[in-house]
Design a protein with these regions (language model features):
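Metal-associated gating/positioning segment near the N- to mid-region
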Residues: 1-47
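Active-site mouth loops of central-metabolism enzymes
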Residues: 1-10, 68-82
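Aromatic/hydrophobic pocket-lining residues that form π-stacking "cages" and hydrophobic walls in ligand
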Residues: 14, 39-40, 84, 119, ...
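Active-site gating loops and adjacent loop-to-helix segments of metal-dependent hydrolytic enzymes
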Residues: 16, 20-24, 47-51, 56-77, ...
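Active-site core of metal-dependent hydrolases
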Residues: 102-223
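His/Asp/Glu-enriched, well-ordered alpha-helical/loop segment
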Residues: 198-280
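C-terminal cap of metal-dependent C-N hydrolases
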Residues: 272-324
Length: 325
């Protein structure tokens, strides 16, 4: 998601979107760069109950002007590989790696290969992972995937743009399968326009199931819907994943991918002590995408209680009326 609240036009207040959906830990996906990360770390993140970590944008100021300029990589002078890598190394535990947006509005096709190369260099120098926004890429998807190594993340992987994980015949591209085989993570990164129901169905029918389920929660432009985590888990269950698999893809698996599995993602002794309790509601529920495709399901996870570090940080209204428990 994007949690540099007050620092970018697309960021949200994490507590208002995470805790009430059963989420205790949010990963900011490149809202800040090396020039403004300190402000996000020192003044924004501490004002939240939600545990917040981040990926550092390859551009110096992240998404500070994305709602005005459309993206942060229109001029390659905004990238400084060494300062980006140094910032990540100086903030181990808070910064997990590098984020680069390969979207046609964020970077021109003639600059996209350069931005990918520099993002790869910064990730390697920092020792962190590389997350790439692949939805709407101005260059062929295989060229983007060529830069990704084991443990790196292809987010918005199930988008419906021309350069999606499917080829023109609707088959999963061989380059995508090769990337998965070498350990590249296929992340949902749902957002409002970056997850196409028909692409998900086709990919899953061919054995390409999401590694991780994420919201890319942000302040959406008018006319767009952005789902919270409990709805996404429910939606992907309706799309054919088992409920245990959807839960794993939104808890334990992301913790592994982000190298946080020693503290987060499960309830074994010694972990942070985070948990979420849901009502499993039965009925008729419909989720949609911006292409007009709908998914109908029979169950939905409704948040009831969220616990972080062994302490209740959010509770549904009925529980408040019951008193202390």
């Amino acid at each position: 998601g994007h949690f540099y609240h007050g620092g970018t036009g697309s960021s949200v207040h994490a507590d208002q979107h995470c805790l009430g959906s059963g989420v205790t830990t949010g990963i900011d996906a490149g809202s800040s760069g090396f020039l403004n990360y300190d402000a996000m770390r020192d003044y924004v993140f501490p004002a939240h109950q939600t545990r917040l970590l981040a990926l550092l944008h390859i551009g110096a100021v992240g998404l500070a002007a994305n709602r005005i300029l459309g993206g942060g990589l229109h001029d390659m002078r905004i990238i400084d590989v060494d300062r980006t890598a140094e910032t990540i190394k100086e903030n181990q535990g808070g910064l997990l790696g590098v984020k680069v947006r390969m979207h046609m509005d964020a970077v021109a096709y003639w600059n996209a290969p350069i931005a990918m190369k520099l993002a790869r260099e910064a990730a390697d120098k920092s020792g962190g992972l590389l997350m790439v926004h692949v939805s709407g890429t101005p260059i062929p998807l295989p060229q983007v995937l060529d830069h990704l190594k084991s443990g790196d993340i292809s987010t918005h992987a199930f988008n419906g743009y021309t350069e999606s994980i499917l080829d023109n015949s609707g088959k999963v591209r061989k380059e995508v399968r090769e990337a998965v085989d070498r350990g590249v993570i296929m992340d949902v990164g749902h957002a409002g326009v970056h997850c196409d129901v028909e692409v998900v169905k086709s990919a899953m029918n061919q054995g390409m199931v999401p590694d991780t389920i994420s919201t890319d929660i942000h302040l959406a432009p008018p006319g767009r819907s952005v789902y919270l985590m409990n709805d996404l888990v429910s939606k992907f269950h309706a799309l054919g994943m088992s409920l245990p698999d959807t839960i794993r893809a939104s808890t334990w698996r992301p913790a592994q991918v982000l190298r946080l599995q020693d503290n987060l993602g499960s309830l074994v002794p010694g972990m942070a002590g985070d948990a979420a309790v849901f009502d499993l509601r039965e009925g008729r529920f419909v989720w949609h995408d911006m292409a007009g495709h709908n998914v109908e399901g029979k169950v939905r996870l409704d948040p009831f209680l969220t616990v972080k570090g062994g302490r209740i940080v959010w509770q549904e209204g009925r529980l408040s009326q019951m008193g202390e428990c």
